[in-house]
């Protein structure tokens, strides 16, 4: 007599609660038994995700999967299960879309800007073989690491495809990384070759003797006659991209395709503290993540995608893999974010994936224009906006009348064809999301993920009009919430379970490169990755991010503080562009450093009749500080912050937190230790002010 394995019994239990009978809705053939929620104590229907019949060690039923694939985690594209690697994915695209436009750029060889010129999928395939063969010509071997140290342009993706075809490991570097970080990554990954541009070449040459593993530097956009000559004995060859192409074409090599379990890339996370960590991702990891995402969001050969987010970031990388699978045309921005709107007008993309930072700028620009347009136009916009919003809320198709009268002009700001907007990397305000949906008449979806999960952990589902959450689990993973008692978050919380978000599935990275200790800190023995983010389950199985565990600290009285939660509240203040919350175990209260919005400050000062010579002087005016802190307090009360979570003092600064002043990571997260040191004097003064004005000492 044969006994079923635990895995088989678990699968049968799940299937027993699923009705696979035919329905009119062919988009999803899996539906939960109508009696499941009442007949079973552990398997119930949520609109977008399901709770599995898996009892955890804690005795709780707390593992969620996407409703679209509850019985099996997705690891391959459902329509093309033969695609197991990035190489397979590109081969599929070339075979299917060889003559289609693929890579477009406005930047001419002489540096001038014109119309987009395009390379087809077939042409890109030919170039990737030449680049791969050129690397072999220079002694780069299968399994060696190859660096990419330049901003988005067609050559970046060609090199990445070459790495996949010949089983090299691609290692992207942010072009904004400082010399020390670049040096660390090159040495830590033991890079054999690195692709750069003339600007980043100068950085590499400044410490060439300190990166001994490098044997080949390829300069993209540089002419051979302008390349520097290196002294004999360095062991390093510098060639132009065009020369490498020529060398490769003269000696083409057959591909050396990787296996799904082979390393595809090592992505170095910028990190808010310490040195960068190398996230090891396999071909199987990346394919699984994008395949899972494709179950819900689909790209088509008719789509045009604008690429401006750093390709060194996993968000943009995953979008490109999805684009290849769908045969999408990718147009690159000209390299200047301040001219991005001009690129939109010329490219007229249908897909726009960005971060809240830019969406907020679009929102501010449109609302500012509406406010200054006059009473009649402002009122017309409000009527059109509210009418369209109400239709969306009620599940009706908004009248095209309002688009013709009001919104088509706004749509033209992004080229007039955008059908899909994606947002990630940080939370998008619900107000901004609703605004984008209404004004641009397109699908706007927010996702949540991290480099260690190959990108997407969860994303909003098509047709879900509720904002303020990050959707249901990617069909390629399962999610659970783990109690964090020190922050008073538990999966028993009512009305919504809360806890640290943990993820498991084929999307989970293999570990940090050469760092077993930090790998063990984030990845447990059962394969669960602990994200450090705090989430809750909303009705319908939607995940909402509410806090951050990793950056918590204690105040003197023992209360735990999650600064990012508080900063997200305060950045809604009209005066606040950026906010840094500081506290420590020596003080019982928090203080805030606020980078102000210059235009709002100037307008407010003018309305109050306050005279000043420069923005710095205005920031130091006690009346201004008092007003800003009062508005921050109002937002804190509205968000129901606890008493000890309120900032008791604020310092206003005219300059923004930037990559250049060392206060932000390349993904625009605050570097807390650096910010603490940078603003040490201001922090000390604020605590002195609190102590002087409060009979109860702030220090314990």
UniProtKB/Swiss-Prot annotation:
Question: What EC designation does it have?
Answer: 6.2.1.3
The induction field says: Up-regulated by ozone and salt stress.
Residue ranges of region Fatty acid-binding? Answer: 526-550
Reaction equation(s) it catalyzes:
a long-chain fatty acid + ATP + CoA = a long-chain fatty acyl-CoA + AMP + diphosphate; decanoate + ATP + CoA = decanoyl-CoA + AMP + diphosphate; dodecanoate + ATP + CoA = dodecanoyl-CoA + AMP + diphosphate; tetradecanoate + ATP + CoA = tetradecanoyl-CoA + AMP + diphosphate
Q: What happens when the gene is disrupted?
A: Seedlings of the lacs6 and lacs7 double mutant were arrested in postgerminative growth due to inability to mobilize fatty acids for beta-oxidation, a necessary process to pursue the development.
Which residues belong to the signal peptide in this entry? Answer: none
As one GO molecular function, the record gives: long-chain fatty acid-CoA ligase activity
SUPFAM superfamilies to which the protein is assigned, alphabetical: Acetyl-CoA synthetase-like (SSF56801)
**Major subcellular location class:** other
In the record, biological process GO terms are:
fatty acid metabolic process; response to ozone; response to salt stress
Q: Name one GO cellular component term.
A: peroxisome
Q: In which pathway does it act?
A: Lipid metabolism; fatty acid metabolism
Where along this sequence does the record place binding of ATP?
Answer: 266-277
Does this UniProt record's set of keywords contain Nucleotide-binding? Answer: yes
Name-wise, this protein is Long chain acyl-CoA synthetase 7, peroxisomal
Q: What organism is recorded for this protein?
A: Arabidopsis thaliana
């Amino acid at each position: 007599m044969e006994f079923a394995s635990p895995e088989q019994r678990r699968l049968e239990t799940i299937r027993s609660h699923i009705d696979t009978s035919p329905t009119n809705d062919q988009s999803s053939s899996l539906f939960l038994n109508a009696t499941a929620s009442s007949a079973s104590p552990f398997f119930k229907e949520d609109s977008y995700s399901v709770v599995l019949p898996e009892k955890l060690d804690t005795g709780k039923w707390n593992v969620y999967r996407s409703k679209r694939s509850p019985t099996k985690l997705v690891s391959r594209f459902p329509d093309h299960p033969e695609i197991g690697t990035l190489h397979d994915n590109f081969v599929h695209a070339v075979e299917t879309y060889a003559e289609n436009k693929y890579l477009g750029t406005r930047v001419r060889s002489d540096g001038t800007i014109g119309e987009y010129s395009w390379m087809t999928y077939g042409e890109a395939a030919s170039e990737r073989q030449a680049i791969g063969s050129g690397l072999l010509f220079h002694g780069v071997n299968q399994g060696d690491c190859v660096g990419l140290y330049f901003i988005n342009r067609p050559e970046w993706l060609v090199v990445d495809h070459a790495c996949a075809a010949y089983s090299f490991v691609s290692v992207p570097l942010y072009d904004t990384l400082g010399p020390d970080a670049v040096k660390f990554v090159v040495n830590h990954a033991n890079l054999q070759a690195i692709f750069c541009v003339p600007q980043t070449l100068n950085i590499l040459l400044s410490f060439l003797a300190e990166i001994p593993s490098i044997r080949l530097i390829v300069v993209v956009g540089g002419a051979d006659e302008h390349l520097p000559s290196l002294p004999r004995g360095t062991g390093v060859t510098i060639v132009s991209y065009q020369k490498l192409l020529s060398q490769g074409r003269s000696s083409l090599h057959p591909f050396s395709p990787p296996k799904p379990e082979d390393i595809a890339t090592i992505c170095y996370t910028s990190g808010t503290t310490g040195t960068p960590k190398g996230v090891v991702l396999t071909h199987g990891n990346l394919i699984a993540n994008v395949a899972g995402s494709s179950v819900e969001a689909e790209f088509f050969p008719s789509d045009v995608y604008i690429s401006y987010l750093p390709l060194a970031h996993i968000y943009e990388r995953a979008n490109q893999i999805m684009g290849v699978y769908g045969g999408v045309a990718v147009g690159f921005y000209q390299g200047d974010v301040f001219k991005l709107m001009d690129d939109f007008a010329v490219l007229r993309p249908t897909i726009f994936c960005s971060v809240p930072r830019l969406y907020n700028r679009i929102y501010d620009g449109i609302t500012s224009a509406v406010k200054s347009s006059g009473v009649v136009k402002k009122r017309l916009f409000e009527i059109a906006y509210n009418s369209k919003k109400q239709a969306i809320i009620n599940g009706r198709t908004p009248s095209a009348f309002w688009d013709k009268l009001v919104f088509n002009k706004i749509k033209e700001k992004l080229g007039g064809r955008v059908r899909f907007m994606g947002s990630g990397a940080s939370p998008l305000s619900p107000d901004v999301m609703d605004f984008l949906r209404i004004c641009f008449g397109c699908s706007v979806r927010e996702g949540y993920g991290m480099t260690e999960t190959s990108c997407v952990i969860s994303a909003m589902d098509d047709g879900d009009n509720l904002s303020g959450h990050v959707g249901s689990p990617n069909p390629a993973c399962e999610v659970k919430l783990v109690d964090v008692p020190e922050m008073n978050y538990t999966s028993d919380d009512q009305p919504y379970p809360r806890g640290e978000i943990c993820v498991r599935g084929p999307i989970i990275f293999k570990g940090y490169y050469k760092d077993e200790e930090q790998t063990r800190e984030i990845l447990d023995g059962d394969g669960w990755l602990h994200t450090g983010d705090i989430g809750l389950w909303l009705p319908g199985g939607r995940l909402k991010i509410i806090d951050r565990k990793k950056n918590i600290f204690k105040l003197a009285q023992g209360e735990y503080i999650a600064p990012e939660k508080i900063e997200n509240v305060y950045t809604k203040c009209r005066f606040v562009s950026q906010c840094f919350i500081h506290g420590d175990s020596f003080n019982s209260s928090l203080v805030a450093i606020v980078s102000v919005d210059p235009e709002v400050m100037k307008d407010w000062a003018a309305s109050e009749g306050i005279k000043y010579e420069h923005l710095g002087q205005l920031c130091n005016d006690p009346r201004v500080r008092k007003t800003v802190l009062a508005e921050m307090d109002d937002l804190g009360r509205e968000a129901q912050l606890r008493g000890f979570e309120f900032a008791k003092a604020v310092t206003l600064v005219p300059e923004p937190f930037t990559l250049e002043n060392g206060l932000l990571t390349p993904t625009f997260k605050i570097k807390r230790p650096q910010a603490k040191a940078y603003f040490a004097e201001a922090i000390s003064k604020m605590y002195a002010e609190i102590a002087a004005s409060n009979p109860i000492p702030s220090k314990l």
